[in-house]
């Protein structure tokens, strides 16, 4: 039986994996299992994390195969019910949830907190780890054949907590032991961090994830932003001002042209940012139920923020680092801004310096393209 370890041992693990090191730079082309084995060595906790990540990978490979069948497997986009997180559940949402939870039954995981379940699903109450997961991000895109994904975070199961309770999952972002996502697109890719940099894997024809890059870096600056413009009239002034200044192009305070992107699948937007930089914004707004945005802290914002920081990017809630937050609920929502470090810092200044909207000159301080 796997023994749960907490306290100083966990803190030491986080300290020793906080930054990328040459020892963890696995060779391109090796499998995920081999890369994790090299990283874990003889450390018992790391081996538990590695086993859990391998199980997650196995579950996502099943999901990839189901997605590849498309309409041949039936109407995967049909809405079956209203999910516990407050959104309609598609058939593929439920299929994906079952696949990853079944895969994790073979791993040292005490419980799983999923977007598709109200309460955590208990697996092995004595196991040392917890998993928080969005089994299928972007499921509104299923019937249009646009990229969707699976997002996950691995946390320690702290001593004295009931794995079946919500309380066990109410941890700080810095407590995360691993985070990542799988994107199902033209090819299936895995972005993963265990605190030793951000690793990029691609799924080969034989069903193995193989390493593409063990040192992913997000460009510090890029003239591309992703936001749902249809919500413009619901946003607070700092977000409107930031977007207005981007859209003003060379004639505005930014003095450069910007492109806008929006896929309605966070993993797709995140994957583009890892490849070529940019910024993603899903702020809170004035709509009922959207004061704190739409994205979930525990199983969406936390893992993507971990990946971003490990790739020299940044992730904030508008003012503070996402990873400095502590969850207060399994399905807690949070405003989420992430991407190129310099651009995220600039967006933060629009919140922190509202009177001048960051670096705006007086000419633009009270001007907007739509007001």
From Swiss-Prot:
Binds 2 magnesium ions per subunit. PROSITE patterns: FBPASE. Its EC number is 3.1.3.11. The keyword Magnesium applies. Its cofactor is Mg(2+). Homotetramer. Belongs to the FBPase class 1 family. This is Fructose-1,6-bisphosphatase class 1 1.
